[in-house]
């Protein structure tokens, strides 16, 4: 995979919340039900520092003997206040997880096929992208969604923040002609977030 230009070196505050992995494990358990198989290949889109990777890993390992779990993040070189990048943090979180890889890359450069795809908080409006200082050319929600669908073999779980983003996401899904189920507000016994989140399950 081609390396991504290290265009983002901004520093921002905020330490990793270790409950993220437990939250992700919880919502995957509530909303996904993979069929047990010998091998599974899973993609996480927009992984950030991938602090929650253990939640995804533990969930999907229940359903297979051999798991390949890839994470892709276009803004992998953003710095924390401690001067460690997302990429460096992600390497720490995945170091003891077999079959897990983190790619500092653009989703559009990914060409492998995946049984399942997890996409938490995709950019469906330009404001978050601008807030993080990413070039405007990377705001292409329709193209990214359709490319993700091309990579998908079974199911994709998308989570959006707030009703407005969920409504936009639904329009993107309709425009792409994808088969999906709107899950409503995503519930979890682990309360980490102030704003409600909404989910979609896309199937092939």
Language-model regions, residue ranges each:
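Class I SAM-dependent methyltransferase Rossmann-like catalytic core
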Residues: 1-38
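Class I S-adenosyl-L-methionine
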Residues: 5, 9-14, 166-204
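A generic alpha-to-beta junction signature in SAM-dependent methyltransferases
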Residues: 36, 63, 150-153
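Class I SAM-dependent methyltransferase SAM/SAH-binding core
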Residues: 43, 47-101, 106
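A short acidic, Gly/Pro-enriched loop at the edge of an enzyme's catalytic core
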Residues: 105-118
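A short SAM/SAH-binding and catalytic strip from SAM-dependent methyltransferases
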Residues: 116-138
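Short strand-turn motif at the edge of the Rossmann-like AdoMet-binding core
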Residues: 122, 156, 160-164
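A short glycine-rich, Lys/Arg-flanked "PGG" loop and its adjoining helix->strand segment in the class I
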Residues: 131-154
């Amino acid at each position: 995979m081609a390396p991504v230009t290290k265009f983002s070196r901004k520093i921002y505050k905020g330490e990793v919340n270790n409950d993220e992995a437990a939250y992700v494990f919880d919502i995957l358990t509530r909303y996904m039900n993979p069929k047990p198989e010998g091998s599974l290949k899973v993609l996480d889109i927009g992984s950030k520092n991938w602090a929650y990777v253990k939640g995804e890993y533990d969930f999907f390992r229940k359903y297979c003997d051999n798991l390949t779990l890839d994470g892709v993040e276009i803004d992998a070189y953003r710095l924390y206040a401690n001067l460690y990048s997302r990429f460096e943090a992600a390497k720490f979180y995945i170091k003891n997880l077999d079959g897990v890889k983190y790619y500092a890359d653009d989703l559009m450069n990914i060409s492998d096929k995946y049984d399942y795809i997890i996409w938490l908080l995709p950019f469906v409006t330009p404001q978050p992208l601008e807030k993080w200082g990413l070039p405007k050319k990377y705001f292409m929600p329709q193209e990214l969604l359709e490319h993700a669908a091309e990579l998908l073999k079974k199911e994709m779980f998308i989570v959006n923040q707030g009703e407005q983003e969920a409504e936009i996401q639904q329009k993107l899904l309709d425009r792409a002609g994808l088969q999906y189920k709107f899950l409503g507000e995503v519930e979890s016994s682990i309360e980490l977030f102030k704003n409600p989140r909404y989910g979609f399950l896309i199937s092939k």
